[in-house]
UniProtKB/Swiss-Prot annotation:
EC number: 5.3.1.16
Pathway: Amino-acid biosynthesis; L-histidine biosynthesis; L-histidine from 5-phospho-alpha-D-ribose 1-diphosphate: step 4/9
Catalysis performed (reactions): 1-(5-phospho-beta-D-ribosyl)-5-[(5-phospho-beta-D-ribosylamino)methylideneamino]imidazole-4-carboxamide = 5-[(5-phospho-1-deoxy-D-ribulos-1-ylimino)methylamino]-1-(5-phospho-beta-D-ribosyl)imidazole-4-carboxamide
Organism, as annotated: Ruminiclostridium cellulolyticum (strain ATCC 35319 / DSM 5812 / JCM 6584 / H10)
Gene field: hisA
Domain of life, source organism: Bacteria
Subcellular location: Cytoplasm
Active site per UniProt: D8, D129
GO biological process per UniProt: L-histidine biosynthetic process; L-tryptophan biosynthetic process
GO terms under cellular component: cytoplasm
One Gene Ontology molecular-function label: 1-(5-phosphoribosyl)-5-[(5-phosphoribosylamino)methylideneamino]imidazole-4-carboxamide isomerase activity
HAMAP family: HisA (MF_01014)
Coiled-coil region: none
Annotated protein name in UniProt: 1-(5-phosphoribosyl)-5-[(5-phosphoribosylamino)methylideneamino] imidazole-4-carboxamide isomerase
PANTHER family associated with the record: 1-(5-PHOSPHORIBOSYL)-5-[(5-PHOSPHORIBOSYLAMINO)METHYLIDENEAMINO] IMIDAZOLE-4-CARBOXAMIDE ISOMERASE
Length: 236
């Protein structure tokens, strides 16, 4: 299982939100690039970077910073947030990113998702963000009619190899992941499931490994010190 340290960017700064709320922002650093270097130096094998401004506006607001992170680090970097067309996917991949996460666009623009999976194959991951079991879109501010598992099965049938599954109710709350939901998702599909949301201590990461997910994104817990990244990597 891979541990993905998360870097969320608003206004060029490294931040964390609580339950996806843009009105509840904590700034953890002025330089996302320096933060990325820190996680790499502590042994991270892959980095997860989100343009939160982009997720909300539908445009790549922090693209230059994100490409700078990818060019600075030796480890692979995946990114999402505001990627609504193939041109943006291409810009990020040519800028050094290893994997692109499609969230809202995967739900609302099926043609684009099909084209992206056909063109870029394993370099595309689908972000499935669930609120009360339903898929949330537009920076988590709206919900769709899909259940998370239904949508996952559909994108798998279209050729997706990786999904990032976030339980919004747990995100940024440090109250533990939704193990039942993660296990249900991992059992329902054969593609890689990366779990996100709620990790608050090392035990959560070990418990998630038992659900069958292939990776876990850790955000707030490594910023507050609740989880020691080096220790967590060694433990799994």
């Amino acid at each position: 299982m891979i541990i993905y340290p998360a870097i969320d960017i608003i206004d060029g700064k490294c931040v964390r939100l609580q339950q996806g709320s843009y009105s509840d922002v904590t700034v953890f650093g002025d330089s996302p690039v320096d933060m990325a270097r820190k996680w790499e130096s502590l042994g991270a094998g892959y980095l997860h970077v989100v343009d939160l401004d982009g997720a909300r506006s539908g445009k790549s607001e922090n693209a230059e910073i994100i490409k700078q992170i990818a060019k600075t680090l030796k480890i692979p970097v995946q990114t999402g947030g505001g990627i609504r067309n193939l041109e943006t996917v291409e810009t990020y991949l040519s800028g050094g990113l290893s994997r692109i996460i499609l969230g809202t666009s995967a739900v609302s623009n099926r043609e684009m998702l099909i084209s992206a999976l056909k063109e870029y194959k394993g370099k595309i991951a689908v972000g499935i963000d669930a609120k009360d079991g339903k898929v949330a879109i537009h920076g988590w501010e709206k919900t769709s009619d899909y259940t998370a598992v239904e949508f996952a099965k559909e994108v798998e049938s279209l050729g997706a190899k990786t999904i990032i599954y976030t339980d919004i109710s747990r995100d940024g709350m440090l109250k533990g992941p939704n193990l039942q939901a993660m296990k249900e998702m991992a059992d329902s599909v054969s593609m890689d499931v990366i779990a996100s949301g709620g990790v608050s201590r090392l035990k959560d990461i070990i418990d998630l490994k038992q659900t069958g997910v292939s990776g876990v994104i850790v955000g707030k817990a490594i910023y507050t010190g609740n989880v020691d990244l080096k220790e967590a990597i060694l433990a799994i």
